């Protein structure tokens, strides 16, 4: 169903092709069709969620498959990160899930502070961040662990490497794969050393 009006969100689909669209997956055209054209027949499904604001501009809200199940609730990481990033002391954040005996998964936040946040008491900041999340999304989305970091592992195009953060949150430091292509490979060791 196509969503009309403004102030709405949903899955981002594209109706018409454009010059740079991928035409196939080498050697597996059927997989290409199943991945991008079966969820919404006749439309290209990007895999992203989007928000159309009050004036009709679109904003990508994150991957729709980037969902963590906590106590039976499906929680998208993008809305939680957006809530955290509203805090005046926060510059950027990334959320991952890690196994929890009771909830199935728990939420682990990696948070980069702005300059004014660096001098604040970190325990109070953790409480304030969780209060903001609880207020905007609900108590179920509160983070179990919040680690303050100086940076996040990113590719040269700026994509956060969540698989690395997930392994750190799980306490699995055995194999991160090739991290030499990261924009800032040294940050991985720093985050490992500060793990909660």
Language model feature labels by segment:
Residues 1, 48, 149-155:
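Active-site and channel-lining beta-strand-loop segments
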Residues 13, 72, 150:
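Small/polar loops that bind or transfer phosphate-bearing groups
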Residues 1-37, 75-77, 173:
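Conserved ATP/PPi-binding loop(s) of AMP-dependent carboxylate-activating enzymes
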Residues 32, 46, 155-157:
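Ser/Thr-centric signal marking residues that sit
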Residues 151-176:
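A contiguous, mid-protein "functional segment" used to position or interact
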Residues 18, 23-27, 34, 42, ...:
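AMP-binding/adenylate-forming catalytic core of the ANL superfamily
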